[in-house]
Amino acid sequence: TVERGEILGFLGPNGAGKSTTMRMITGYIPPTAGVVRVGGNDVTEKPIEAKRLMGYLPESAPLYTDMTVEGFLGFCAEVRGIKGADKAKAIDRAIDMCFLKSVRHQSVDTLSKGFRHRTGFAQAIIHDPDILVMDEPTDGLDPNQKHEVRSLIRRMGQSKAIIFSTHILEEVEAACTRAIIIDQGKIVANGTPDELKAKSELANSYVVSINGTESSAVRDGLGTVIQSAKVTIVTDKA
């Protein structure tokens, strides 16, 4: 369960089942077992009602490259049933939130990868959904663009329920209030980023490189100085 005001990171290696799970959550493929409910609606039995509540950013967001950014967002708004003055307001809000003002009237096929990603993000929030589902929203972005997307997710997470997938722990630490780790389609861990880090064998560990000294002597010395320390020699370097 993901509540309003919660940002859930969906963490796992490539091929763990993150994208497949998100497609089931958003109703694009039916689950083979179990039930997915969005706002109380079974996505299999009431797909339209469930999808009205969600914004979805797939890993490769489909964009109509012959449209301008404004035209594409206007089309997405109309598909969502937003028209007239409300449509104009929705477009302005999405463009402002995703920092698209400078390319508002630019054709999508001329955009950089970063701006295309923001345009995909904008279509996901065009109808101001209560729930956002995003598949690796920062994948392929440069460091500045990643920072902008993380900041946007944190801001929106104050009033929405957000799920986003990643295979990078740094993404979870930077934006999430809770994280689930999956492997081969199964949950292997569930907790806050700090709780998951504390469970790691490498939590509160340090790596020391030693040059020109006998590693065994240093290991023995550390064991004497810090009685509770566990010293592991990873690689001997003369």
Residue ranges and their predicted role:
Residues 1-183, 189:
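ABC transporter nucleotide-binding domains
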Residues 149-237:
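ABC transporter nucleotide-binding domain
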